[in-house]
């Protein structure tokens, strides 16, 4: 990056990654004062603030763009230099991806497994709601993101992966207690459901679309674990919207029942990644796309 001292941007990156100046200084093996000075020099060069100094610190819009560029350069550097100096393979290639919890719980790890076993890669998986994974790609925190959004980010491409078919399921006992006469507006209001976090609107969309219930009218537990959704449903704690590929065994055994067999939610998945890729990143995208298209309904 012309005119930019890498050490200055590294300081900004460390403050964001370590969530503060003190830990950033420890990471870089310099003083907090030196970290602060480097960021000030960078801001002076760019003629604008790059860091919002709150707790934890966060980058400004310009800071995000600069960090995105810096992280791309660093990743390419990590990938290319070992090819030039093959004896220097002491550092793994650091690859950060953003994924939704349902993909992680079903097909993503088997898709990446061969690459992780054959390459010297340090994987960092950031798990977010399906609607928020692209934010990580926009900010430059990750090199790729699995999302339900089809819109392409500038400088990136979006490849279709397949469908996630979400079924509304519960244990037989739960069905008997709350839905013995079928699922209706009246019994949905009293039956507990589950959402991943406060950004997860899938549950609300389902009851609004099919049962005309207004947002906020149903009870929902909040659990940030896709695997826990299955356990909560089989334990009879709540009814859940879960991908069919994740619970086929439980359905076959009768541990779970599809309480709305005529109704489901279908969500398309896309792999968003840099348009300019090479080496390991190209291989990663190819493996991920190929596996997903075999594992997911098309």
From Swiss-Prot:
Annotated keywords: DNA-binding, Transcription, Transcription regulation
Pfam families xref list: HTH_1, LysR_substrate
Domain HTH lysR-type: 4-60
Record feature DNA-binding region, as residue ranges: 21-40
GO molecular function: DNA binding; DNA-binding transcription factor activity
Presence of keyword Cell membrane: no
Domain of life: Bacteria
Recorded family membership: Belongs to the LysR transcriptional regulatory family.
Subunit structure: Homodimer.
NCBIfam families associated with the record: argP, PRK03635.1, PRK13348.1
Protein name: HTH-type transcriptional regulator ArgP
Gene it is expressed from: argP
């Amino acid at each position: 990056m012309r005119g930019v001292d890498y050490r200055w941007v590294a300081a900004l990156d460390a403050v964001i990654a370590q969530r503060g100046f003190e830990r950033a200084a420890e990471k870089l093996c310099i003083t907090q004062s030196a970290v602060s000075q480097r960021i000030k020099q960078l801001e002076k060069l760019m003629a604008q603030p790059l860091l919002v100094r709150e707790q934890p610190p966060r980058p400004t819009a310009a800071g995000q763009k600069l960090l995105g560029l810096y992280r791309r350069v660093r990743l390419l550097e990590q990938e290319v230099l070992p090819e030039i100096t093959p004896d220097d393979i002491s550092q793994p290639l650091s690859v950060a991806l953003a994924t939704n919890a349902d993909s992680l719980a079903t097909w993503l790890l088997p898709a990446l497994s061969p690459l992780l076993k054959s390459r010297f890669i340090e994987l960092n998986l950031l798990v977010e709601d399906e609607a928020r994974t692209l934010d990580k790609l926009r900010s430059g925190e990750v090199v790729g993101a699995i999302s339900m959004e089809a819109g392409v980010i500038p400088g990136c491409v979006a490849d279709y992966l397949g469908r996630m078919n979400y079924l509304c399921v519960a244990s037989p006992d739960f069905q008997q207690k709350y839905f013995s006469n079928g699922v209706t507006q009246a019994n949905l209001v009293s039956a507990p459901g589950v959402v991943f976090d406060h950004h997860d609107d899938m549950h609300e969309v389902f009851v609004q679309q099919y049962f005309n219930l207004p947002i906020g009218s149903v009870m929902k537990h909040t659990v940030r674990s896709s695997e826990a959704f299955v356990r909560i449903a089989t334990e009879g704690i709540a009814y859940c919207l879960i991908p069919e590929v994740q619970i086929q065994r439980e359905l076959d055994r009768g541990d779970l029942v599809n309480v709305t067999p005529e109704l489901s939610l279908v969500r398309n998945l896309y792999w968003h990644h840099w348009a300019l890729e090479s080496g390991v990143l190209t291989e990663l995208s190819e493996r991920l796309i190929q596996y997903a298209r075999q594992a997911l309904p098309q």
